[in-house]
């Protein structure tokens, strides 16, 4: 089943859970998207060495399982996102952050699937080196930004550049990395939600 929606339509009234027009992110939908090449990103030849799942498909399943744990989070209502949109957004953020590589490390020290900074991981009470823990921290941090800013683009900017930067600029900061991050995540989210 395909979903026609855009996280850019945040003010639009969305169908409720159980409505036949609101496709759940089922195994069939995941398979369809994977068949279309919309949700498969390579880890560029790296072999995950961390604890937990080893392959990209297993990591993607873990991403969706963790995302499922937060389907009833109040931040989704605050940002006007359905569960399907949340799962697509969360998955896309992880894809862009780490290409599903649990051992990814940035030049500034961000760690793992969600590219959590050590201080952020400490505040969230998660082990950034553990794939599942890292994903829970990433989900909670992204949800906090959705709750604070009420929009997917601003939440992604805050996830990438920090909430202070978004507040200081009154929107997406004019940093090339942050603007690129937001654009890539939203593009992948919308590709996942759209049929081709």
Report each predicted region and the residues it spans.
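Catalytic and substrate-binding regions of cell-wall glycan-acting enzymes that process beta-1,4-linked
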Residues: 137, 157-196
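Substrate-binding/active-site groove segments that recognize
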Residues: 105-126, 137-142, 157, 163-164, ...
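Alpha-helical scaffolds flanking conserved acidic
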Residues: 83-92, 111, 152-157
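Second-shell loop/turn segments in exported
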Residues: 45-54, 77-80, 103-107, 120-131, ...
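Glycine-rich, acidic and aromatic/proline-enriched surface loops and short helix-turn segments
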Residues: 92-99, 119, 161
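Cell-wall glycan-active module
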Residues: 1-95, 187-196
């Amino acid at each position: 089943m395909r979903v026609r929606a855009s996280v850019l339509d945040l003010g639009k009234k969305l169908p409720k859970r159980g409505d036949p027009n609101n496709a759940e992110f089922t195994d069939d939908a995941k398979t369809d998207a994977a068949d279309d090449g919309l949700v498969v990103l390579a880890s560029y030849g790296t072999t995950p060495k961390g604890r937990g799942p080893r392959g990209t498909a297993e990591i993607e399943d873990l991403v969706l399982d963790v995302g499922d744990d937060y389907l009833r989070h109040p931040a989704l209502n605050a940002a006007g996102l359905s569960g399907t949109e949340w799962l697509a957004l969360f998955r896309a953020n992880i894809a862009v952050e780490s290409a599903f590589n649990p051992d990814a490390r940035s030049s500034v020290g961000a760690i793992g699937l969600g590219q959590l900074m050590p201080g952020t991981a400490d505040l969230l009470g998660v082990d950034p080196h553990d794939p599942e823990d890292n994903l829970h921290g990433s989900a909670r941090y992204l949800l906090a930004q959705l709750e604070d800013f009420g929009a997917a683009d601003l939440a992604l900017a805050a996830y990438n550049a920090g909430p202070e930067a978004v507040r200081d600029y009154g929107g997406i900061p004019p940093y090339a990395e942050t603007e690129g991050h937001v654009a890539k995540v939203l593009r992948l989210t919308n590709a996942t939600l759209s049929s081709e």
